[in-house]
């Protein structure tokens, strides 16, 4: 496997180092190329994502990203010029966010039940497509628009991906989350596409919920959800809530996926660069390690992915959550666990 690694900013390099430590135990022959994209490169050269680097990234099987963001860089520069550009250039139309409450992890929900859901969020359309602008700026008559783009092609491919994932899971249940009673045009398109694709998956049960009702049920009855499919904006919001009820975004992994596999998909922990704790060796690398599991599953290394997931599950069930250990110590534990007898029995 040819892997491009973007350690990024803040705690990104620290958690990526531990994720690679675990990866080396399960796929030792991985060919790794590191890229110094992020705040430091921008300060030094003014570059965010040179065309030459983008071309090199395309030649890899997958990309592992640590975190991007630094208070010394004006807000939005790294996000738009690096993260969003990668997403659009590499056609990462599926944003995949699993949310599982592992044994041993405390949820802020009083009676959460068994939480094991996957949110399939559309990643290249909606209001993030950049269709909008300002008229009469800085006047009392200023107008700001942000147009949500929803194409039949874009909606169908993410809905098909969500149905395929639902069909492969034990519960075989899919929920469309939208706001069809108000966003009638986009809502109609999403609803019709889900209905059409559902005919090809008679084994998958289908439900619909308004996005506001979804936020309620994620807190009061999160175990009802299996696979959720939704648009870019709604997905951005509810995935953070899903992370919060399953132990926080410090345990949340994500994948930015080109389901056609024409471009390398990118995997990253959901947490940010956390510059306030960077360099202290206290960042939890678990989300980065779980991102490696998603990566391995995507490239066809499912057995290795199960070992990594089982190692994380064992560690979370047995660790002292009030003092989980230094960054390197957690990485060492997980690297040892992926080859242990305990994990072999669970994987």
UniProtKB/Swiss-Prot annotation:
The keyword Transmembrane helix does not apply. GO terms for biological process: L-leucine biosynthetic process. It is found in: Cytoplasm. It is an enzyme of class 1 (oxidoreductase). Keywords: Amino-acid biosynthesis, Branched-chain amino acid biosynthesis, Cytoplasm, Leucine biosynthesis, Magnesium, Manganese, Metal-binding, NAD, Oxidoreductase. NAD(+) binds at residues 272-284. Its cofactor is Mg(2+); Mn(2+). The record marks 128, 179 as: Important for catalysis. Pathway: Amino-acid biosynthesis; L-leucine biosynthesis; L-leucine from 3-methyl-2-oxobutanoate: step 3/4. Its EC number is 1.1.1.85. Its main location: cytoplasm. Transmembrane segments: none annotated. InterPro entries: ICDH/IPMDH (IPR050501), IsoCit/isopropylmalate_DH_CS (IPR019818), IsoPropMal-DH-like_dom (IPR024084), LeuB_actb (IPR023698). GO terms for cellular component: cytoplasm. Pfam families: Iso_dh. GO terms for molecular function: 3-isopropylmalate dehydrogenase activity; magnesium ion binding; NAD binding. NCBIfam families: PRK03437.1 (NF002898). Catalyzes the oxidation of 3-carboxy-2-hydroxy-4-methylpentanoate (3-isopropylmalate) to 3-carboxy-4-methyl-2-oxopentanoate. The product decarboxylates to 4-methyl-2 oxopentanoate. Homodimer. This is 3-isopropylmalate dehydrogenase. It comes from Saccharopolyspora erythraea (strain ATCC 11635 / DSM 40517 / JCM 4748 / NBRC 13426 / NCIMB 8594 / NRRL 2338).
């Amino acid at each position: 496997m040819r892997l491009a690694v973007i350690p990024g900013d803040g705690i990104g390099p620290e958690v990526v180092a531990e994720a690679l430590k675990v990866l080396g135990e399960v796929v030792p022959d991985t060919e790794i190329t590191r890229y110094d994209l992020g705040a430091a490169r921008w300060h030094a050269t003014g570059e965010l994502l040179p065309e030459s680097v983008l071309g090199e990234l395309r030649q890899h099987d997958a990309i592992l990203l640590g975190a991007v963001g630094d208070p010394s860089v004006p807000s939005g520069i790294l996000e738009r010029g690096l993260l969003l550009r990668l997403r659009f250039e590499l056609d990462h139309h599926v944003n995949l966010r699993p949310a599982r409450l592992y044994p041993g992890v405390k949820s802020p929900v009083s009676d959460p039940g068994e939480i094991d859901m996957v949110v399939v969020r559309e990643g290249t359309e909606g209001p993030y497509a950049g269709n909008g602008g300002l008229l009469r700026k800085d006047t009392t008559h200023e107008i700001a628009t942000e147009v949500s783009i929803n194409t039949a092609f874009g909606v169908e491919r993410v809905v098909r991906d969500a149905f395929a994932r639902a069909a492969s899971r034990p519960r075989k249940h899919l929920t469309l989350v939208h706001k069809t009673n108000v966003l009638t045009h986009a809502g109609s398109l999403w609803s019709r596409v889900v209905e059409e694709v559902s005919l090809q998956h008679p084994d998958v049960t289908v439900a619909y919920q308004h996005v506001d009702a979804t936020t309620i049920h994620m807190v009061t009855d999160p175990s009802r959800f299996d696979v959720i499919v939704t648009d870019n904006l709604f997905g951005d919001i509810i995935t953070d809530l899903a992370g919060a009820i399953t132990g926080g975004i410090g345990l949340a992994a994500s994948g930015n996926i080109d389901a056609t596999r024409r471009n390398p998909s990118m995997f990253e922990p959901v947490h940010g660069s956390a510059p306030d704790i960077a360099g202290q060796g206290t960042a939890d690398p678990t989300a980065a390690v779980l991102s490696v599991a998603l990566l391995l599953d995507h490239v066809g290394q499912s057995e290795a992915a199960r070992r990594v997931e089982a190692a994380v599950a064992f560690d979370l069930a047995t660790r002292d959550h009030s003092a989980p250990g230094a960054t390197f110590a957690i990485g060492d534990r997980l690297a040892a666990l992926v080859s242990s007898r305990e994990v072999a029995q669970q994987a």
